[in-house]
């Protein structure tokens, strides 16, 4: 295995592990006693001290900060935070205005929006294997979640917010991938978390519900949200996006509903049936097929001869 393939495999494994880790966010949110937007605010705010320590003692980050960062690099890192803030805020309101199943299913359309944006704005082309994997994974998500979805005019606002969530998360993935082209993982994570916290704070303060946890025990789910889901899980995804195409990253994140369903079954005794198993298998098959297609595209690009006139 050459160096490029090793980097790809390592990055893909990081994205998978990160996706599995951030699936716990839904469980921590459910255990929290603060308002949804407050939970999103505390998620990034509690992550900031650990991210700062990481940034402070990371040699590559110090070297880049010690030099002159270009404005585009700074704005890109801030853009990651803006897209993430939009994603979290829209997602929470979507859940409030429609069913959890509808909101989750529509948010998973981020994989489609990522692929469309990559094609329209960055000229990315996709192999049949990748497109087949995308369709399989989406079919799996629909099978896993769709049996609990509902079609009703009273959910139209929430459903539209669910689609908006998908657009925001697609923007987050694409901008994060571009940021990782010139910035380290801790730089992207700290800059985006700080931006997200600043954007969400006023919304968290004016939203109905609890802002501060009422007891020490009530802080524990928020610490899990900030330290495990965000610092550990989200950092793995950001790390992986330096070597894995954003489109493959977005498809891989479809593993989250599978893990969330397993955690809900284990912790809350929520029922799992045949359709859940079928959906999970389709998602796994789709991810592996998309991985194969993305890897083929990368290898083909490396093998293209360089024009001597360029």
Predicted segments, located by residue:
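Helix-helix packing/entry segments at the starts of transmembrane helices
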Residues: 19, 103-109, 176-197, 230-266
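Hydrophobic/small/kink-forming positions within alpha-helical transmembrane segments
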Residues: 23, 45, 81, 85, ...
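C-terminal-most transmembrane helix of multi-pass membrane proteins
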Residues: 44, 218-220, 228, 254-310
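Glycine-/small-residue-enriched transmembrane alpha-helix faces in small-molecule transporters
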Residues: 1-42, 47, 51, 79-82, ...
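Specific alpha-helical transmembrane segments that line the substrate/conduction pathway
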Residues: 38-49, 92-125, 165, 246-265
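Hydrophobic transmembrane alpha-helices of multi-pass small-molecule transport proteins
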Residues: 51, 55, 117, 126-147, ...
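Specific transmembrane alpha-helical segments of multi-pass solute transporters/efflux pumps
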Residues: 21, 58-101, 107, 115, ...
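Hydrophobic alpha-helical transmembrane segments of multi-pass integral membrane proteins
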Residues: 10-14, 38-56, 129, 133-139, ...
